[in-house]
Amino acid sequence: MKINGNEIRPGNVIEHEGGLWVAVKTNAVKPGKGGAYNQVELKNLINGTKLNERFRAAESVERVRLEQKDFSFLYEQGEALIFMDTETYEQLELQKDFVGDRAAFLQDGMMVTVELYEEKPIGIRLPDQVTLAITEADPVVKGQTAASSYKPAVLENGIRIPVPPFIASGERVIVDTNELTYISRA
């Protein structure tokens, strides 16, 4: 579907320079001299590279609709992650580097959304929040209450995040998978 350059919004996926790009940020610019344009920060869906482009209002670009399917995470096999389509029960194998650092958050039976373009997976979305146990946390130092301070803690999946001083080893916490930050106690 063709759209004008000034209609590109964050989250839109477009075909540009022979690749698929997602708009991360957009900024409509109206200079005093010359025509208005849309300054767009793009991220390549395949290799993750970023690009800044200007699109004039008269320019048209191809907007791509991605198919989104729900999959359930089954298990890990070496460098491969195995998922199952919840509708057809077909299995899908993705490499760990496709998922990236967030692969550590995958748990048995976790529901994820896989984005497909022409039946080929190009992206994966994990739940925004997961509940994990703290395996290691520094003890609280008395008298550090003047300012809010966070201490480092290690989650059961090995990822280090800052947590409030009252969190101890063994407690379960809710973690934001996008920002890798503590949200609350579970």
From Swiss-Prot:
GO terms for cellular component: cytoplasm. Pathway: Protein biosynthesis; polypeptide chain elongation. Keywords: Cytoplasm, Elongation factor, Protein biosynthesis. InterPro entries: Elong-fact-P_C, NA-bd_OB-fold, Rib_uL2_dom2, Transl_elong_fac_P/YeiP, Transl_elong_KOW-like, Transl_elong_P/YeiP_cen, Transl_elong_P/YeiP_CS, Transl_elongation_fac_P. The keyword Cytoplasm applies. GO terms for molecular function: translation elongation factor activity. The keyword Cytoplasm applies. It is found in: Cytoplasm. It holds the Pfam family Elong-fact-P_C. One of its GO terms (biological process) is peptide biosynthetic process. Involved in peptide bond synthesis. Stimulates efficient translation and peptide-bond synthesis on native or reconstituted 70S ribosomes in vitro. Probably functions indirectly by altering the affinity of the ribosome for aminoacyl-tRNA, thus increasing their reactivity as acceptors for peptidyl transferase. Belongs to the elongation factor P family. This is Elongation factor P. The lineage of its organism: Bacteria, Pseudomonadati, Pseudomonadota, Alphaproteobacteria, Hyphomicrobiales. The gene is efp.
